[in-house]
Amino acid sequence: MSNQLSLFSEENVPFVNEVEIFNQTFGKINNYEPTIPEKKEWQFVYDFVLEELEEYRQACENGNIVEVLDAICDLTYVATGNGTMLHGLKDKIWPAYQEVQASNMSKTCATETEALETIAKRSKELSVACHFEKVGDRFVVYRSSDRKVMKSINYFKPDLSQFFTTEELAKNYLAETII
């Protein structure tokens, strides 16, 4: 793990900690157990994310890098911070993020042999030409027509259920919300 990533932990999650303090200060919701709150609560976060995403699009179209940074910060604040605290996922977001990162990186191949096997499999199943390129110490397989990354034969989907207890997974979250 890089030095920067080691600064993060289940207790120290930048963006989430700051939003938790903001919510406490302004009387907003901080949940500490997994939950799907009432629709008006999650709809607010959803709409806010869409608003910030639109600001990002406009900033890009206008070529305004300062506004791009502002939009990215706002998106992170709302989606990562508010979303995490609203749904009671503070203790899960960082290990879940690491699992997603590991899954994303499993799209690459560790060896040239693995890359060649991936090309053979993806070319056959998709009927498309593929090639690989060495990037650092990894091999990335691309669909040749558009450079779409092809998943390695050793790709794995992230298992986010591992971050929930049996009781949390068995709970019917819709039963306690107003939809």
Task: Annotate each language-model stretch with its function.
Residues 2-72, 76-179:
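Flexible "arm" and connector segments at domain edges
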